[in-house]
């Protein structure tokens, strides 16, 4: 026999379901647009998801949801929504333009050109504004493609020219992994370690790899790091990121243990140094006798 508490809970749940069903796709869209206006992209995305469930063939809902995905850095999902947009409305020019812009930013110049050709093929340039934007975008794509080809040549010939061309290209395609890698390498060749490290850090977020995280950790901690600087903290953070992506990576595990041990010894030694206890400083840096030296002196 159902208890009073169970009956009340079921009645409340039924009421919630009825209220949820009463909210239309149009209502969810209003909520989503309001969330976008207030920069609540996660809230907008949730509302768009509900709208899609209720009206899965509304091309405008997919188009608007792609905006929320882009704001949250979900490029792949944004492109999928734009693809669905033109599936349901092949003549909707704004979707082609937005897709081509994303592909340009990502450094996918061939795909961006193909997208604009598809726009032309489906006669999607319904407005004069769309035509002008498509022409301007096509010129940017051609320029970016030309810069990339020149950068490939300069990369092995002139570090100065390489950095200059990469700077120009990254203004058009800031998420181009190839261009950013080449600028980092050329910056290092010019002796600009700070610039190279900045690009490597961006690459580590765009395309994480254990090798890159290890490199950034060593540079940040041992070369760029100074006492009480954020760079030493960054050195440890890069190794934590490596272990987060690949918990079984032996190199990152070993490096993380070593760096934590060194960091602990340095902090201990600095404390003794502040108190002018010089013998204790040396002992702290050498480590326990049984465990061998922490640092080579």
What do these predicted ranges mean?
Residues 24, 58, 92, 109, ...:
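Residue-level recognition of tetratricopeptide repeat
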Residues 24-54, 146-173, 182, 265-294:
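Alpha-helical segment of the N-proximal tetratricopeptide repeat
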Residues 37, 71, 105, 140, ...:
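Register position in tetratricopeptide repeats
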Residues 51, 84-85, 119-122, 168-169, ...:
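Canonical positions in the second alpha-helix
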Residues 54, 88, 122-126, 172, ...:
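Structural marker of alpha-solenoid helical repeat scaffolds
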Residues 64, 98, 130-133, 137, ...:
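Canonical tetratricopeptide repeat
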């Amino acid at each position: 026999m159902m208890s009073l508490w169970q009956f009340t809970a079921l009645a409340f749940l039924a009421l919630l379901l009825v209220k949820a069903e009463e909210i239309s796709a149009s209502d969810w869209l209003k909520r989503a647009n309001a969330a976008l206006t207030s920069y609540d992209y996660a809230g907008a995305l949730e509302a768009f998801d509900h709208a899609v469930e209720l009206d899965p063939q509304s091309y405008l809902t997919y188009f608007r949801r792609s905006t929320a995905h882009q704001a949250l850095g979900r490029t792949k999902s944004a492109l999928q929504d734009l693809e669905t947009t033109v599936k349901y409305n092949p003549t909707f020019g704004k979707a082609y333009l937005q897709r081509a812009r994303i592909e340009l930013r990502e450094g996918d110049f061939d795909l961006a050109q193909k997208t604009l050709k598809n726009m032309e093929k489906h006669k999607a340039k319904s407005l004069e504004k769309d035509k002008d934007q498509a022409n301007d975008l096509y010129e940017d794509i051609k320029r970016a493609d030309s810069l990339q080809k020149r950068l490939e040549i300069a990369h092995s010939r002139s570090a100065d020219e390489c950095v200059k061309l990469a700077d120009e290209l990254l203004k058009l395609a800031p998420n181009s992994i190839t261009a950013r890698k080449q600028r980092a390498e050329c910056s290092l060749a010019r002796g600009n370690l700070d610039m190279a490290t900045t690009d490597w850090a961006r690459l580590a977020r765009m395309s994480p790899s254990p090798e890159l995280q290890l490199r950034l950790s060593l540079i940040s901690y041992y070369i760029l790091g100074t006492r009480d600087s954020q760079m030493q903290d960054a050195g440890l953070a890069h190794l934590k990121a490596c272990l987060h992506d690949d918990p079984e990576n032996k190199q990152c595990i070993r490096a993380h243990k070593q760096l934590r041990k060194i960091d602990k010894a340095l902090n201990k030694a600095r404390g003794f140094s502040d108190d002018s206890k010089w013998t204790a400083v040396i002992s702290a840096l050498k480590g326990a006798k049984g465990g061998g030296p922490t640092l080579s002196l």
